[in-house]
C-alpha cells in the first residue's frame, strides 16, 4: 500500500511529464556531471595557486552549487523522485528500480568515496590548502551519492503513453 504525500503528489503530477522523457533526463545527467567536473577542475586549479581559496573560486563554488538546485530538481522530476521519497510512498516497481540502481552503482560509489578521502588527504598534504581539500572531498563524495540518480535517469525507458480510447 502506498501513501500519497505532498512530495509524492508533486513527483506524480502530470504537469511535469515533459521532464520524464529520456532526452530530458539524459541532458540533466550530463549537465549535473559536467557541473561537478567543472567544480572539481576549479578546485584543483585553485589548489595550484599560492592563495588557494580566492574570491573568484568562492564565486564559482557558490554559483555552481546554486545552479545544481534547479538541475537536480529537473532530474528528480524525471525519475519521479524515487530516491527522495519514503518507501511508503513508492509502489513495488518504483522500489525495485531504486534498489536496482543502487545495486548497479555500488562499486563505483565505493571507488568515488575512496577517491574523496584519498584525494582530499593528498590535496591537503601536497598543497596545504585544507579548505580546498575539503571541497574536493565533498564534491567527489557528492558525485558518489548522485550515481544512483544518474544511473536510473540514464537507463529508465520513456514512459508509455496511455491510450485514451483503451478505457
Model-derived regions: residue spans:
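Membrane-water interface of transmembrane alpha-helices
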Residues: 69-86, 151-156
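Hydrophobic alpha-helical transmembrane segments and immediately flanking/interface helices
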Residues: 56-61, 120-150
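Hydrophobic alpha-helical membrane-embedded segments
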Residues: 49-77
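Short membrane-interface loop/juxtamembrane segments of multi-pass integral membrane proteins
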Residues: 86-104
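Alpha-helical transmembrane segments and their membrane-interface junctions
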Residues: 37-47, 109-128
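Juxtamembrane/interfacial segments around transmembrane helices
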Residues: 80-90, 109-119, 162-166
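Cytosolic-side membrane-entry/anchor segment at the start of a transmembrane helix
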Residues: 1-36, 149-167
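Juxtamembrane loop-transmembrane helix junctions in multi-pass integral membrane proteins
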Residues: 16-23, 48-55, 97, 126-129, ...
Amino acid at each position: 500500500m502506498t501513501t500519497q504525500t505532498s512530495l509524492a503528489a508533486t513527483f506524480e503530477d502530470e504537469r511535469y511529464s515533459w521532464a520524464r522523457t529520456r532526452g530530458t533526463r539524459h541532458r540533466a545527467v550530463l549537465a549535473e556531471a559536467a557541473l561537478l567536473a567543472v567544480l572539481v577542475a576549479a578546485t584543483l586549479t585553485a589548489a595550484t595557486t599560492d592563495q588557494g581559496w580566492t574570491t573568484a573560486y568562492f564565486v564559482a563554488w557558490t554559483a555552481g552549487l546554486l545552479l545544481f538546485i534547479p538541475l537536480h530538481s529537473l532530474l528528480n522530476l524525471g525519475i519521479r523522485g524515487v530516491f527522495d521519497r519514503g518507501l511508503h510512498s513508492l509502489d513495488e516497481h518504483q522500489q525495485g528500480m531504486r534498489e536496482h540502481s543502487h545495486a548497479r552503482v555500488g562499486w563505483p560509489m565505493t571507488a568515488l568515496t575512496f577517491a574523496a578521502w584519498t584525494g582530499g588527504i593528498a590535496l591537503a598534504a601536497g598543497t596545504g590548502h585544507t579548505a580546498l581539500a575539503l571541497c574536493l572531498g565533498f564534491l567527489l563524495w557528492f558525485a558518489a551519492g548522485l550515481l544512483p540518480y544518474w544511473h536510473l535517469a540514464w537507463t529508465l525507458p520513456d514512459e508509455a503513453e496511455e491510450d485514451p480510447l483503451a478505457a
